[in-house]
């Protein structure tokens, strides 16, 4: 499965390809392969009711932030919610048996009280999917 997003005009489009035992992050000419086994944490985030993010924290690597949007111009934002939701579900399917990742959610509406809540990869909280 492949998913492409672009959260801001300052960033190049990012494509993430899910394979059997790893994911590949493609940004411009750069490609990074990350085995599912080294992903330590997945954090699902929802803000403003329409913005969704999945943050992957690989062991020893930079966090990977995946969004449900693709910014085409300064005014135009393409909503990729359906593809994002499918991508997140397939990612969790791969991680459940191939990773020891912790899974949690954070709502950023109230930044003062941002307590992560844990969940099982087989029971993704629906309010964190578009």
Positions of PLM-derived features:
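Anionic N-terminal interaction surfaces
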Residues: 1-15
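Short, hydrophobic/aromatic-rich segments at coil-to-beta transitions
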Residues: 1-3, 20-23
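Short, exposed beta-strand/loop patches in secreted or surface proteins that constitute
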Residues: 14-18, 55-57
């Amino acid at each position: 499965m492949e998913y492409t997003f672009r959260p801001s005009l300052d960033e190049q489009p990012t494509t993430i390809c899910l394979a059997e035992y790893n994911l590949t992050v493609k940004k411009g000419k750069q490609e990074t392969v990350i085995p599912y086994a080294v992903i330590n944490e997945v954090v699902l985030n929802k803000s403003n009711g329409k913005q969704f993010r999945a943050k992957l924290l690989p062991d020893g690597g930079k966090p990977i932030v995946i969004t449900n949007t693709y910014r085409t111009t300064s005014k135009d934002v393409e909503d990729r919610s359906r593809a994002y939701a499918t991508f997140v579900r397939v990612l969790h399917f791969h991680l459940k048996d191939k990773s020891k990742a912790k899974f949690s959610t954070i709502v950023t509406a109230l930044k003062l009280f941002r307590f992560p809540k844990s969940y099982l990869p087989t029971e993704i909280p629906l309010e964190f999917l578009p």
